Amino acid sequence: DYQTGSLRDDFDFGSLQLIRTSAIRHFLNNGRSPRYRFAGLYALRLFISSKGEIVHLREPLYSEIETDLRVSGQKQFDYVNPRNKEVQQEMERACAEHLKQIGAWLAPDELNELPADTTVYPVEASVIIPVRNRARTICDAVNSALSQQADFTFNVIVIDNHSTDGTAEALLQYAQNEQVKVLCPTRHDLGIGGCWDYAVRSEYCGRFAIQLDSDDLYAAPDPLERIVAAFQQQHAAMVIGSYRMVDFDLNTLPPGLIAHTEWTAENGRNNALRINGLGAPRAFRTDILRQIGFPNTSYGEDYALGLCFSRYFRIGRIYVELYLCRRWEGNSDAALSIESQNRNNAYKDALRTMEVQARQALVKRWNHPLNEEEISKFFDWQLTRWDEARERYEALASQVQTRVLPLEDGELRVQYNPSRIVSTGAKVDKKSLKARPCFLCENNRPDTQRALPVMGSIEVLVNPFPILPHHLTIPTRRHTPQDFNRFASLLD
């Protein structure tokens, strides 16, 4: 049934839909509905969903002849078919407009700085292969990973999820290979996501965790190198590559290369809420992945992480072929029943619902108005939790000095605090500034210093080196060149 997160444009309502005339008129006359060639009904549906409830009448009222007889494994890639590019661009535009109206759209510059990772890892990268009952393909996958050529250390972590078909026996050939770690969880309730979580939290996992499904292959000797380079070059917390659909004998199947070129730096993470997948292979910074954790499911676990990562961090993209996705009779999603499709779609809609709500809360927190009483309470609260700053404020009365400067028509009394020489005596030449971390950025601030977000892009901080009884610092939330015009609205 329809949820807040039912944002995919292929949501199947059936052919019979009843819409209030007043709702259509409201949509057409609201002054912000652009003209659409393909996305008109989709945009109307999103608009109505933001104003009221969409009800599913659970009663068969008509029948129709199904004309699209393709299996689910073929239909699921319609949105990346180049022939549908113009349609998809319109759908993306309609979805972005909807997200803006409901307060869930994230601007492209609203990205967290990547935290420093001081963890000591056994290797730089780990290829993660969850497996259950893939005796026919598991060794192909492991050998594909081992054939990678890289100028850094890497290993292969296989999680055998209680296979019963000879998979465990097939993996015995790697028992003496230090580069291959076969893990056997004691729990019997783990899905693919649970196996991933088990692997990335193990002592063997490297700095980057990189996907390889148990029936797939890497397309060349260098995907690991390309992925790790993308983390560094694109300053990303997650990297997604491109893959080609092939049969078991590696012959190309439609639609061929799936590169997700619809992704843009400007709107990719918003459009991710509309489409049903983000691509493969997927790779993660292990430290951040351990903080978020994998959902313990065997469907949509990767999509859930992509949404969560994109809420806070930049997702890097590689648009050249890295991966071969083999379609064969053993695939779990090659030809799903309508009941399974509905169940999977409902789960992803639920993921999107949670993500929309999380983004709405984030945007609301950023955009709440400036309030003098709230700032005063924040100031007092901060000093109760920051002993060093509180002591400086308590000593302020005895430390502050004044100096009288004579003027032609009177005098000017200047107040200053000698203890601030620690912060004001720093070098300000170009080289020194470039080498010094920005003390206003969240990752470089003391753990005890908190920020109060206000007015969209501004934060309020308590200054730890005061010259005033209530000394505040007001930077932008993101690291940008300071510009007085950004703060002009504060003076109104």
Model-identified regions with their sequence ranges:
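Active-site microenvironments that recognize anionic phosphate/pyrophosphate groups
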Residues: Q360, K364-P481, N485
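Conserved donor NDP-sugar-binding/catalytic core segment of glycosyltransferases
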Residues: D1-T4, D222-P255
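Acidic donor-binding loop at a coil-to-helix junction in glycosyltransferase catalytic cores
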Residues: R35-L44, S298-L305
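Short beta-strand-to-loop acidic/aromatic patch adjacent to the donor-nucleotide binding site
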Residues: G206-L217
